């Protein structure tokens, strides 16, 4: 199965909450101790279903449950984002950062998936906004990032933007060529209880992480 262009897959109550909570607590505790979560790449064949909580989530997400271009996916780049009130994740596109920095060329993953680990409460703001009008090629041009970010912040879901509210234990899979942002969090996320998203980008080759 492949995701059609402009398509997005959303699955709620995706995994057992005990695994979600273990990953949430691990990431949050490390952050409180100022331990960096280093982004990493792992080949699909090397994912240990009995490993740590992140390995288990990877395996359950992409090996056990998703059958999206399984024959093309070589492995996954993994990172996280912790966001609190007033934070915004500005317009960007997921890409091979090493290739972008060394050759000034944008190469996208096959797909981006993000799993929301916490908080358990809802948020005011903190939505994932996917642009259906602009593509990664537009980001190479002289476009006004601020105005497009503002457009995404204020848009409602329609032909130009798809806005996906935050929800605990929600998995979102989308076309990585789509520019996206996270809208400003106005309520519901704090330093003690931030919005945590675990991102797993599916690649058809091994990328170098920075």
Regions found by a protein language model. Name each.
Residues 1-81, 86-89, 127:
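Non-heme Fe(II)/2-oxoglutarate
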Residues 72-77, 82-210:
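Catalytic core of non-heme Fe(II) oxygenases with the double-stranded beta-helix
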């Amino acid at each position: 199965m492949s995701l059609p262009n402009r398509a997005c897959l959303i699955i709620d109550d995706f995994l057992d909450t005990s695994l979600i909570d273990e990953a949430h607590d691990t990431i949050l505790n490390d952050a409180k101790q100022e331990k960096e979560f280093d982004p990493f790449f792992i080949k699909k064949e090397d994912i240990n279903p009995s490993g740590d909580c992140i390995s288990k989530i990877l395996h359950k997400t992409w090996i056990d449950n998703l059958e999206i271009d399984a024959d093309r996916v070589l492995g996954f780049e993994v990172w996280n984002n912790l966001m609190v009130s007033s934070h915004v994740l500005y317009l960007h596109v997921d890409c091979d950062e090493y290739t972008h920095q060394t050759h000034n060329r944008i190469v996208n993953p096959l797909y981006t998936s993000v799993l929301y680990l916490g908080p358990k409460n809802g948020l005011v703001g903190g939505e994932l906004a996917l642009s259906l009008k602009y593509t990664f090629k537009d980001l190479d041009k002289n476009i006004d990032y601020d105005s497009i970010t503002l457009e995404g912040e204020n848009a409602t879901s329609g032909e130009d933007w798809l806005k996906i509210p935050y929800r605990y234990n929600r998995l979102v899979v989308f076309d990585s060529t789509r520019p996206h942002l996270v809208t400003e969090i106005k309520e519901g996320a704090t330093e003690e209880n931030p919005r945590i998203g675990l991102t797993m980008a599916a690649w058809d080759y091994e990328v170098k992480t920075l």
